[in-house]
Design a protein with these regions (language model features):
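Alpha-helical structural motif
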Residues: 13, 56, 76, 80, ...
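Extended aliphatic helical segments
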Residues: 21, 27, 42, 51, ...
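Short coil/turn segments at secondary-structure boundaries
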Residues: 31-33, 97, 171-175
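N-terminal accessory targeting/assembly segments
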Residues: 2-76
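Phenylalanine-focused residue identity feature
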Residues: 29, 33, 56, 90, ...
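P-loop NTPase catalytic core of nucleic-acid-dependent motor ATPases
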Residues: 39-47, 125-177
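Long, basic/Gly/Ser/Thr-rich N-terminal segments
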Residues: 45-127
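Generic detector of solvent-exposed, compositionally biased contiguous segments
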Residues: 3-8, 77-95, 146-156
Length: 177
């Protein structure tokens, strides 16, 4: 393995970790409660992680390992997280994170909470699955992935299982659903 330049060897692991976060195009920001987050490209989609989460910490460790085949020292990791957190809070934009569902620009947006971070956009004209929505959603560990909607379904098929006397009642129930 070639010898590292002296200046490169003197840079702390914390500094290297901070630079790697920037190089990976992570967007640091704070939410409406002033909590630091990162918007990170994972495979082919974007995810939002709290900076102090285990997931972000593990990702940070993997960045250094992939870059230098070294594990970060505990103090370096703590220092880097503190600086990243500070940059998110004081230099990052404030972005409102929504929880599961929100109304935005004439559409209802519903987070499917699935592995691909897909969202359903619902308008008067129908619905579509969006992979890069204009709004961001907060995720919690207890949230389960939702069923992905299917265009081949027929909501009228529910009528055969309903015991409703009047046609208007069926319509009212279907509108409610």
């Amino acid at each position: 393995m070639p010898e590292e330049p002296l200046a490169e060897r003197r840079r702390s692991q914390a500094d290297k970790l901070i630079e790697l976060v920037t190089a990976e195009r992570a967007v640091l920001f704070r939410d409406q409660f002033n909590e630091p987050h990162a918007h990170i490209l994972v495979d082919d989609h974007w995810e939002i992680w709290r900076v102090r989460s285990k997931q972000f910490r593990r990702w940070l460790c993997s960045l250094l390992w992939e870059s230098e085949q070294k594990a970060p020292h505990s103090n370096a990791l703590t220092s880097a997280l503190t600086i990243i957190e500070s940059r998110a809070c004081f230099k990052g934009e404030q972005i409102t994170l929504e929880n599961r569902v929100c109304w935005y620009e004439g559409a209802l947006w519903y987070d499917l909470s699935n592995r691909n971070w897909e969202v359903v956009r619902i308008t008067e004209g129908g619905w579509e699955i969006v992979t890069d929505p204009p709004i961001l959603f907060r995720r919690y560990a207890h949230q389960s992935a939702q069923v992905v909607p299917d265009t081949s379904g027929d909501i009228e098929a529910l009528n055969e299982f309903l015991n409703l006397a009047k046609e208007e009642q069926k319509l009212l129930l279907l509108v409610y659903l």
